[in-house]
Amino acid sequence: MLKEAIQYLVSLKENKTYQLNGEIYSDRELVRVAPHVDRPGEVRVNGLDSIVKLVSHELDMLENLPVYIRVVSPRQVEVFSTLDSVMGRDDLYVAVCDAPDFAAGKWMPHENAIIALRSAFVPNEGTEYLLDLLSRISKEDGVTTEDNGVSQTVSARQGIALKRFEQVRQRIALRPYRTFTEVEQPESEFILRLNEDAEIALIEADGGRWKMDSKAAVAAYFEEKLAGEIQDGRVVVMM
């Protein structure tokens, strides 16, 4: 009796297959055990120059070539290897831009707008115009804004007022810091809005074109810095 029980328990460990109507069935689910593969840990940095140095110094240590540099967004770059023998990739490096991201489209108090224009934008004619405009806005008992969708005028009545009546430019070319500082910040147009609380808003008006321009600039940076590695086929840059 004990012998039969032991034999029964042993039989439970066996995987049995059955053929029914030309198909093979198993009486238990099989789970594939993937082979262990040593892979490097992903390195996170904040600059494009760091990616160039890592690729230049460690490329000869890698077996699975080429290495792909993918510009994911204006603020992120990923580097990974090609497929290996078990169809896996090594995630090597990630660069994430740590420059402050300008909050386009949000209302900013008068003082905050001045600080943002001086710290979060590359100086150009557009920032000069806005700083001059804001310097001539004063608190009053009230204000009236007239807006026909094309232009806006501000006059004193309640909230804020320009020290003299004038028409405000609606579309202004600006270059906020929106991508890695190693490349030129893209210029794009913004729509300027003013309200009765002395707040301003800058709304992107280029349909997101600046994102493609930024990614192209980042890709061009790598193509210049890693020209030799790209030419011999060990590095591929893509967007």
Protein language model regions, located:
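Membrane-inserting effector segments that mediate pore formation, membrane fusion
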Residues: F102-V154
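Charge-rich, solvent-exposed alpha-helical interaction surfaces
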Residues: A5-Y8, L54, A116, Y221, ...
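Surface-exposed polar/charged interaction patches
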Residues: L12-N15, P40, L54-M61, L65, ...
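Long, compositionally biased interface segments
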Residues: V183-Q185, L192-M239
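Amphipathic, membrane-active segments
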Residues: R44, L48-R70, Q76-F102, V143-I200
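Amphipathic alpha-helical interaction segments
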Residues: K16, S26, V33, Q76, ...
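An N-terminally focused, membrane-permeabilizing/fusogenic/translocator signature enriched
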Residues: M1-E78, D232-M239
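Intrinsic-disorder-associated interaction segments
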Residues: L2, E23-S26, V37-R44, L48, ...
